[in-house]
Amino acid sequence: MWSSLNDWLWNERLWLPANISWAQLEDHDGLVFPHPQDTLMAVPLALALVVVRFTFERFVALPLSRWLGVRNQIRRPADPNATLEKHYLMKGREPTESQMNLLATQCGLTLRQTQCWFRRRRNQDRPCLTKKFCESSWKFVFYLCCFVCGTMVLYHESWLWTPVKCWENYPHQPLKPGLYHWYLLELSFYISLLMTLPFDTKRKDFKEQVIHHFVTIILISFSYSLNLLRIGSLVLLLHDSADYLLEASKLFNYMHWRRMCDTLFIIFSLVFFYTRLVLFPTRILYTTFFESIGNFSPFFGYYFLNILLVILQLLHVFWSWLILCMIYSFIKKGQMEKDVRSDVEELDSSDGEAAEECPQMKNGAAQRPGAAPTDGPRSRAAGRMVNRHTPAT
């Protein structure tokens, strides 16, 4: 049964052009070619990268964040309340107005007190600034290393500058060691990102990030198995060229170096727009749609490859819109307000609210309505603070 399923899955009539068979992609005469089973090595490597990442964050990024003055915002914990906690965990973090009124009645609280409890409870679950700094530090180091390695591997290759050469003598293109190791490293990294996604900072484009990671993993595995490494390597290098700039911008933002953060964000935006909205459709999509079938008639693998690339392009357009929103805010207000994808810190209470609307914490219990807050202006100042950072792809 397994043999039949494997034969059906790797049917050469599906994945390869006419008159091309898997036998032609076997190693021969000292030449090495990609094999689908090679991609299995990426799984243990991804697990190793997860270990390396948490080691890096714990022993390098965390001390570095303290040395650079990154400090977490002090958050007031929500008062223990079994009824509100049950609703928060079971029915949602943001109750409707009718649910809020019902919960307030059940708990003997005012509507403002109930709203304040949910605000504080949501803020408790939001990642701290140090955690974000550590995540971005790891991604910055890895993206930068991948971009440098990819540039070194591809710089002298003719298809880097002339994408149509990706299809010369296809699929009889021997696998070079440098390209193999870089490709496997990229695949392992994206698998590790998928593994740690539940533990990473969640943003409003979480679903789009999941789609992106899945599509990228499938695209890398698929292109490797079908010896489409040339065009696949161009896609990877194009993406790596902007990602490290984004993470660098975030790092400076967490350090509150506003001018450096804004400058890097503008540079990132220009690189992103040029690589994702200009080069990707005109150089990558054009050659995969039209130039790739110069010597072959369309086949299933051709359509599958282009569907994956179009999905990536749609994600590029989506993220470009978010970046444009950030740039509009920058032009209008003179600095980056916040990431439009961010799960931002909510204000504990506005300056005009009375103390009774959001009771202050004292020894784990709420003060009676009308009582003066114990921390005075500091609580209002902390309440105004929001978590700001730039968007990621």
Curated annotation (Swiss-Prot):
Q: What class of enzyme is it?
A: transferase
Q: Where is this motif: Last loop motif?
A: 291-301
Residues exposed to the Lumenal side: 1-31
Q: Where is the composition biased (Acidic residues)?
A: 346-356
Principal localization? Answer: endoplasmic reticulum
* Transmembrane intervals: 32-52, 140-160, 179-199, 209-229, 260-280, 304-324
Describe its function: Ceramide synthase that catalyzes formation of ceramide from sphinganine and acyl-CoA substrates, with high selectivity toward long and very-long chains (C18:0-C22:0) as acyl donor.
Gene Ontology biological-process annotations:
ceramide biosynthetic process
Q: What's a Pfam family in this record?
A: TRAM_LAG1_CLN8
For the region Homeobox-like, give the residue spans.
67-128
Known catalytic reactions: sphinganine + octadecanoyl-CoA = N-(octadecanoyl)-sphinganine + CoA + H(+); eicosanoyl-CoA + sphinganine = N-eicosanoylsphinganine + CoA + H(+); docosanoyl-CoA + sphinganine = N-docosanoylsphinganine + CoA + H(+); tetracosanoyl-CoA + sphinganine = N-tetracosanoylsphinganine + CoA + H(+)
Could you identify this protein by its name?
Answer: Ceramide synthase 4
Glycosylation site list: N19
